[in-house]
UniProtKB/Swiss-Prot annotation:
The protein's name: U7-theraphotoxin-Hhn1a 1
One cellular component term from this protein's GO annotations in UniProt: extracellular region
Highest taxon of source: Eukaryota
GO MF term list: ion channel inhibitor activity; toxin activity
Cystine residue pairs: 51-65, 58-70, 64-81
Native source species: Cyriopagopus hainanus (Chinese bird spider)
Compartments (UniProt record): Secreted
Propeptide residue span(s): 20-50
Pfam families membership: Toxin_12
Tissue: Expressed by the venom gland.
Transmembrane segments: none
Family annotation (InterPro entries): Huwentoxin-1
Description of its domains: The presence of a 'disulfide through disulfide knot' structurally defines this protein as a knottin.
Length: 90
């Protein structure tokens, strides 16, 4: 009986240690992912956009990208960039 209780307590202790390790690893991974997202966000903010992307609002002074065309779409009350059925060349 004492052996069974000791085994159960030991198993619970092992599970607690493993759980703590996984939680610490998950937290480190989460922090690393957050840093990566912030780096990508900062890099994209520095790029100047010359054209409007898909479903973006467009006017004469805000043109759509090459593979998009500016169209009036009902019930939206302004022009938006929609696909012109072509693909951008890379």
């Amino acid at each position: 009986m004492k052996t069974a209780i000791f085994t159960v307590v030991l198993a619970l202790a092992v599970f607690a240690v493993l759980s703590f390790g996984w939680e610490a690893n998950e937290k480190a991974l989460s922090e690393e992912f957050t840093e990566l997202i912030h780096e990508k966000e900062a890099a994209s903010e520095t790029e100047a956009r010359e054209c409007r992307y898909f479903w973006g609002e467009c006017h004469d002074h805000m043109p759509c990208c090459d593979w998009l065309v500016c169209r009036y779409k009902w019930p939206i009350t302004y022009n938006i960039c929609v696909w012109n059925r072509t693909f951008p060349e890379k």
